C-alpha cells in the first residue's frame, strides 16, 4: 500500500488518468444515481440519506469555513499598513529592514500555526483548536491595531513585528482546523453539491476578504484624508476583529463531525501512534498535493506584480485613493473564478478543475509575457486579459487545492495532512517574495526593460503547466465519495498492518465502520433503492 498512488507501468502513467475520470464526473448522472453511489460508499448503517441541501446542514460548514474571510481580510490589510508606514516614516523605512520584517514574519507565523494546529486538530481537539484559533485571531488583530506602540519609531516597528508574527500563527491555525471541519460537514451534504459548498465557504471567503480589505481603505481615505494615515491603518486592520468575533458565538454551538467522532486518534498514546504506517500510506500523494500548493503560492507573487504595471500605466503619480480604487478592481477578478471553480469541481471533479484552470492560466501568462510591450499600449485590453488570467487562477488551484488536500486524506490524520500541505504552500510564497525580486534586479538594467517582468512571468507560467501535469497524471481520483472511501481504506490498512483499530474513535464505533464497509464491498446492499418520491 505504500506505493498505491505510484504508476506501475508506462501505460498506467500515460492512460491511467483517463479511467479515473469516470469516478469524478457527475455530468449526465441523475440524482438517483448519485445517491445510490453515495449510499454504497457510506460507512454508517444508521446515517440518513440526504437528498437535498438544507440550512441546518449548511450552517456548520459555513461557520467553520467562513472564518477564513478574516484571514483574507487581515492578511491583505497588511499591504495597506505597509503602504501607510512608508508614507508616514519615509526616512526611517529607508534606514532599516522594518518593512521587510513586518511582511516576512507573517509567513513564519503562518507556517508555525499550520503545522502546530494541524497536530492539535488531530490529536487534541478539532473544535477546540478552531476555537483557540478564533480567539487568537481576534486578540492579535486587535493588538496589531491598538497595541503597536514604541518610545522610538524602531521600537514601534519591533512591536508591530511581534504582534504580526502571532497574528500569522492565528491565520495559519485556521487552515487545518476550520477548513478541515468545513470539509467534513460539507461531506454530509447531498452528492453532487459537496465540493461547491466547501470551496464557497473557504476559498471564496478568503477572496471576499481580499475584496473587502481593498474596499475599506478606499472608503477610509475619504473619511480621514491623506493627512491622517496613522488613524486610517489602525482602523482598517482593527475592523478585521468584527467577523471572527461574530463567528465565535456561532462556533460555540458546533459539534465535531460524526466521522471525526468515530475515527479520531485522540486516545492513541504517543508511543502507539502509527507514524511510520501513516508516512508509508500518504507520502506520495502528500508530496504531490504539497508541490502543487507550493507552485501555486510561489507563482502568485510574480502574478501580483502586474497590478503595479497596470496602475503605473493607467494613473502614473496618482493620489492614494485612485491607486486603492484600482486595487478593488483587481481583487474583484478573484470572485468569478472562485464561484465558477467551485461549481466545476462538482461536475468534473477538483483534480481536473485544478488542472484545467492552472493550465489555461499558464498559457495566458505566457501569451501576456510575450505580448507585454504591445499590451501596455492598450491598457483596456490589458486589464481584461489580466482579469481573465486572475479568474482562472482562482477557478483552478485557488478553489481546488484545499479541496484536494481535504479529500485525499483520512479523517484521523486530515488536520496534519492539510496543515503540512498548506505550510509548504506558504513556504512557496515566502520563497517567491525573495526569488522574484532577485530575478527582476538582474534584468533591471537590461536593454529590453520588459524582461524585468517577462522572465519571472515565463517561469511562473511554466510552473503552472507543470502543476497541471502533476494533477492529471499523479493525483488520485477524487470523486464525491472520496472521504468515505479514504476512511475505509485507511482503517483497513491500519488493521492489516497490526494496528489495534479499537483505539480509534470512541471505542466500538470503528468496528461498525469496518463491518459496514466490508459489507458494502461484498454487495450486501445492492438491493438499495431510492424512493423517488423523496427526491
Swiss-Prot record:
Regulation: induction: Expression is positively regulated by the transcription factor PHO4.
GO BP field: carboxylic acid transport; glycerophosphodiester transmembrane transport
InterPro entries: MFS_dom (IPR020846), MFS_sugar_transport-like (IPR005828), MFS_trans_sf (IPR036259)
Glycosylation sites (chain numbering): 75, 256, 532
Domain of life of the organism encoding this protein: Eukaryota
Annotated knockout phenotype: Triple deletion of GIT2, GIT3 and GIT4 impairs the uptake of glycerophosphocholine (GroPCho) and reduces virulence in a mouse model of blood stream infection.
Family to which this protein belongs: Belongs to the major facilitator superfamily. Sugar transporter (TC 2.A.1.1) family.
The protein's name in its UniProt record: Major glycerophosphoinositol permease GIT3
Organism annotation: Candida albicans (strain SC5314 / ATCC MYA-2876) (Yeast)
Organism taxonomic ancestry: Eukaryota, Fungi, Dikarya, Ascomycota, Saccharomycotina
Name of the gene encoding the protein in the UniProt record: GIT3
Amino acid at each position: 500500500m505504500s506505493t498505491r498512488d505510484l504508476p506501475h507501468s508506462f501505460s498506467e502513467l500515460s492512460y491511467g488518468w483517463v479511467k479515473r475520470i469516470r469516478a469524478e464526473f457527475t455530468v449526465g448522472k441523475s440524482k438517483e444515481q448519485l445517491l445510490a453511489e453515495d449510499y454504497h460508499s457510506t460507512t454508517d448503517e444508521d446515517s440518513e440519506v440526504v437528498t437535498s441541501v438544507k440550512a441546518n446542514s449548511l450552517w456548520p460548514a459555513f461557520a467553520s469555513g467562513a472564518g477564513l474571510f478574516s484571514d483574507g481580510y487581515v492578511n491583505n490589510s497588511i499591504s495597506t499598513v505597509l503602504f501607510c508606514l512608508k508614507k508616514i516614516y519615509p526616512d526611517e523605512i529607508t534606514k532599516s529592514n522594518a518593512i521587510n520584517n513586518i511582511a516576512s514574519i507573517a509567513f513564519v507565523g503562518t507556517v508555525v500555526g499550520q503545522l502546530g494546529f494541524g497536530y492539535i486538530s488531530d490529536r487534541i481537539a478539532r473544535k477546540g483548536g478552531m476555537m483557540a484559533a478564533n480567539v487568537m485571531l481576534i486578540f492579535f488583530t486587535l493588538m496589531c491595531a491598538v497595541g503597536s506602540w514604541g518610545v522610538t519609531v524602531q521600537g514601534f516597528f519591533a512591536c508591530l513585528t511581534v504582534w504580526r508574527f502571532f497574528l500569522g500563527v492565528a491565520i495559519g491555525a485556521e487552515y487545518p482546523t476550520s477548513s478541515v471541519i468545513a470539509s467534513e460537514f460539507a461531506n454530509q451534504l447531498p452528492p453532487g453539491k459537496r465540493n461547491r459548498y466547501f470551496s464557497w465557504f473557504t476559498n471564496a471567503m478568503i477572496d471576499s476578504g481580499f475584496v473587502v480589505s481593498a474596499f475599506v481603505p478606499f472608503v477610509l481615505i475619504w473619511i480621514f484624508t491623506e493627512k491622517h494615515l496613522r488613524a486610517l491603518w489602525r482602523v482598517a486592520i482593527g475592523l478585521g476583529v468584527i467577523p471572527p468575533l461574530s463567528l465565535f458565538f456561532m462556533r460555540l454551538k458546533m459539534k465535531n463531525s460524526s466521522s471525526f467522532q468515530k475515527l479520531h486518534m485522540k486516545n492513541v498514546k504517543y508511543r502507539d501512534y502509527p507514524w511510520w504506517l501513516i508516512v508509508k500510506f500518504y507520502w506520495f500523494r502528500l508530496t504531490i498535493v504539497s508541490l502543487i500548493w507550493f507552485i501555486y503560492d510561489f507563482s502568485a507573487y510574480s502574478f501580483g506584480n502586474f497590478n503595479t504595471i497596470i496602475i503605473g500605466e493607467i494613473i502614473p503619480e496618482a493620489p492614494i485613493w485612485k491607486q486603492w480604487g484600482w486595487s478593488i478592481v483587481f481583487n474583484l477578478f478573484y470572485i468569478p473564478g472562485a464561484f465558477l471553480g467551485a461549481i466545476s469541481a462538482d461536475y468534473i471533479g477538483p483534480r481536473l478543475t485544478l488542472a484545467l484552470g492552472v493550465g489555461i492560466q499558464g498559457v495566458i501568462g505566457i501569451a501576456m509575457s510575450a505580448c507585454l510591450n504591445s499590451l501596455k499600449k492598450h491598457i483596456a485590453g490589458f486589464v481584461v486579459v489580466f482579469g481573465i488570467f486572475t479568474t482562472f487562477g482562482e477557478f483552478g488551484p485557488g478553489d481546488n487545492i484545499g479541496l484536494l488536500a481535504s479529500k485525499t486524506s483520512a479523517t484521523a490524520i486530515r488536520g496534519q495532512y492539510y496543515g503540512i500541505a498548506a505550510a509548504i504552500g506558504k513556504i512557496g510564497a515566502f520563497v517567491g517574495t525573495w526569488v522574484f525580486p532577485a530575478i527582476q534586479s538582474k534584468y533591471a538594467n537590461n536593454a529590453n526593460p520588459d524582461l524585468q517582468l517577462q522572465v519571472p512571468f515565463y517561469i511562473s507560467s511554466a510552473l503552472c503547466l507543470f502543476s497541471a501535469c502533476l494533477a492529471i497524471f499523479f493525483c488520485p481520483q477524487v470523486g464525491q465519495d472520496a472521504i468515505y472511501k479514504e476512511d475505509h481504506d485507511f482503517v483497513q490498512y491500519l488493521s492489516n498492518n497490526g494496528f489495534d483499530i479499537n483505539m480509534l474513535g470512541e471505542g466500538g464505533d470503528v468496528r461498525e465502520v469496518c463491518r459496514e464497509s466490508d459489507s458494502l464491498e461484498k454487495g450486501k446492499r445492492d438491493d438499495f433503492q431510492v424512493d423517488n418520491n423523496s427526491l
